[in-house]
Amino acid sequence: MENLDDPADRRREWFRYYSEKRVVHQWFQVHLLAGLEDVEKVLEVGPNLGLVTALLVNAGFEVTTLDLVPPRHGLAGVRHIEADLRQVKPETLAGFDCLICCETLEHLPWDAIDDVLARFAASAVPHLVVSVPYQGFQVDARLYLNAHRWRQYFAFKKLNFLRRFRPDDDPEGHHWEIGYRGHSLADFEAKLAAAGLTIERRDFTSPTRSVFYLLARP
């Protein structure tokens, strides 16, 4: 993973990574906490450059981040835990009101996420926000028009359930995505249930296509 100590390098990576659709997608991670009045302390897994971290801090939450690598967010005062999700102990995750793990699980092998979800549940954190890429059947059509400019967007996903997902060549890339053959939404939700997690809310985003869950322990 690239070192971003140089401000110019950081700006280039920031503008490359944070497209409009990705910024809206990351805002939604924070928006799911609206109305959870018992949430003050948040553990964010996989913060990357720290946009969600900064939004959480700005919203008034006490934030700790966790990642396999040292922090890249550059936010003073945000505690960081350097750990592997596949090995982290539940007690390391304990003591928070909410755990956010968005767009991270797909970077692990499919069979490895059962144990990670079980660790989340065993931590006794009362609220969890989880999202993973969703490529199941969906249609997104939109049009913007005024007297000076117009733009349109259209996406139609329909037959991915017939195909196997092709993992990225990058070993740190995606190992799977929901909606492909062998990785259905029902399969993923069965893993959540097996870990002892209850779905309180499920939602979908586009054009960064993901399925989001607000989860709780029964």
Regions found by a protein language model. Name each.
Residues R149-D187:
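C-terminal alpha-helical "lid/dimerization" subdomain adjacent to the S-adenosyl-L-methionine
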Residues R10-R11, C102, S131-Q135:
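Short loop/turn segments at strand-loop or loop-helix junctions that form parts
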Residues M1-C98, D114-L117, S123, G173-R217:
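Conserved N-terminal segment of class I S-adenosyl-L-methionine
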Residues V129-K158:
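Conserved class I S-adenosyl-L-methionine
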Residues L108-F120, V130-V132:
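A short, conserved alpha-helix within the catalytic core of class I
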Residues P71, V88, H107, Q135-F137:
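Active-site loop signature of alpha/beta-hydrolase-fold enzymes
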Residues C98-D111:
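A short SAM/SAH-binding and catalytic strip from SAM-dependent methyltransferases
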